[in-house]
Structures are given as C-alpha cells and as structure tokens.
C-alpha cells in the first residue's frame, strides 16, 4: 500500500516538502481551476505533474498517482442536454491523464452537494476542532433558511419541533455561518458556492429524478467511460455518498454495500472500482465496513481512511481522530493489506489519511476545511504505525480479543 496526500495546488499554502515530512510518497490532486464539463489538456496536466514530481536535490521524489476528481457534471447526472458533450470531455481528460501515467481517478455521483457538514470547527475534548454534521441544525437550515418546497414531509414532528427551536435561537451571524457551511462548495466539491435562491433552483432541477433514475444515469456514464478506461489500464473509483443518506430530498445511490453491488453487477468492467471511504460509509451503523472491504477488495484501488463518531440516534456525527470513533481501522487495514499482497506491484492500493483535526499551530492559520496539515500528518502516522505492525508481526487480528 502506498501513502498519499491530498494536495490542492501551490495556492493552498502547503509546500511539497511538508508532504515529504508527513511521510507520504504519492500525491492526490486535480485541476480544480478547469470548469466542470471542460476537457483537461495534456499541457495543463504536464504543468501540474512537473510541479509535483520535479524533485530538489536531496529530497525523496513524489508521484502524482491519483486524480481526485474529474468532476461529473450535473448534466451527466441528470442525463441532460449537455451529457454527451460532458461525457466526451470526461473521457478526453481521462485519456490525457493516462498518457501522463496517472491511472487512478476518483469521482462521485452525488447531485448538487458533494459532502455536507453543519459545523467546520466543532471543538473536541482535546481543544482541537473537527467537522460535524448536526441533524437538527441541518433540518433548521432546510426548513427555515432554505425553505425547500416539500421539506416538511422528510422530517418527523419531533424533528420539526427541534429544528424550529434551533432556528429561533440563532442570531444573524449564526445563520450566515450555517449558510456558508452547507451551501458553499467545499474541497472536492463539484459545485460552485451557491446563494439560497440559486441553491433552491438547482435542487429543483432534480425534482423528477429518483434513485432508480440517477442509478440509470450512472450506469449510462460508466458504460461510456469504462471501455476506454479498460483499454488504458485506468481504474475508476466511485466515492461513497457523504453522508450516506438522502439530503434535501435528493437521491443517493452509493451509500451501502447493496448500492455498490448493484453498480458492479450492472457494469462489471475491470476498471469499475470504488474509493473505499471509511468515514463516509462508517456514518451508517448498518454498514459493516470490514465485510464491505472484504467483499469488494479486488475493486478497491484507492482508500480514504478516517473515522467518525455517531451521536444520539446516529444521524448526527462528528469526525473522530483516525484511530477512534466507530471504525475498526485495524481490522480494515488488515483486509486491505491482505488484498494488496495478492496484487502485482503496479496495482497496489493507494490510501490517504482523510481529513484531520485542526490542532496546534493550525488553529491559528487559515486552512482548507477538513484538510489541516498537522491533523492529517498525525492520522497518516497512526495508519502507518498499524500497517508496520501488521506487516512485521503478520498478525491474525481478532477485534474481539
């Protein structure tokens, strides 16, 4: 398994030497500046690749191994008028990446919003901050700030009472911050920052699309791109929904083991794989992560390793330290290592410590939400320690011992 680091480019303020010092050898990056639906050119890719892989004397090399992501446009997700054009541009971008030996591509198929949190700086018991999703605050936003048409039917009477109480206790600053947290694009998002009216309008474009319809559109997309990916040796890794349930009445189709089984059955191409994100899938108590990892091990080409802690009835959660929370990280790494040992050298599983707590000096710095340097470095070191121990001892790990 190879250790990777998500790097948002030179403007993000994280020097590549910091990546080396964290212990990573591989880079996960993307051309975020290219508009959605527009082809990535070889020249653009080479420029970014050279920036990453030009190694100063005495430094260990870094390799741009994974793209996260080539955004999938809303027209593709809705099978809209521009879908054919956008799929063509997506394929052309994939071909350009393959020509430059970048052959793992992460993407998602979540409509409108990629990942959603109500709090980007929830204070933990250590004083570090983490991202958090509060179900009642989310409902307050949906019902009383966004005022989505038909939202009431998605919430119980108890939910609606709690949401109103929260909304009525909020001042204007808190309301504005909640809007920023939920309605603005976050790292990895395929959307632009949205105003409330624009957000409502975008949601309305999915009004006639249910989960079955969205899944058909995903299958149509995969049937177009996987033959080319197979011919190029490219691995496509579908990221799970985050959180793995419906938000804003929108359909979700990559939330459970059954969802992925249906996708792989519909398009069994070798290139059709998954990004095994333990944080996203782990939010649901009914997702057995070790079982999912074992069932789909041969299709896991990229992994996001992080943990979440469910609160109350499980709909509220916060991002835990990497070895804490509700994720059996040791058991999962054991399964991934077993799979990795079966593979040829060029097919190893690439993973990154996903997200991290904002701590120490990062508390005083402007950081990309979810991606502070120190918290991710801590997470990567902890994961590396587990891998080193499992490799050295060849443990038959039993989580019940």
UniProtKB/Swiss-Prot annotation:
GO terms for molecular function: ferrous iron binding; manganese ion binding; mannonate dehydratase activity. It comes from Brucella melitensis biotype 2 (strain ATCC 23457). It comes from the Bacteria. It is an enzyme of class 4 (lyase). It catalyses: D-mannonate = 2-dehydro-3-deoxy-D-gluconate + H2O. Its cofactor is Fe(2+); Mn(2+). Catalyzes the dehydration of D-mannonate. One of its GO terms (biological process) is D-glucuronate catabolic process. Its EC number is 4.2.1.8. Belongs to the mannonate dehydratase family. Keywords: Iron, Lyase, Manganese. Pathway: Carbohydrate metabolism; pentose and glucuronate interconversion. Transmembrane segments: none annotated. InterPro entries: Man_deHydtase (IPR004628), Xyl_isomerase-like_sf (IPR036237). The keyword Transferase does not apply. This is Mannonate dehydratase.
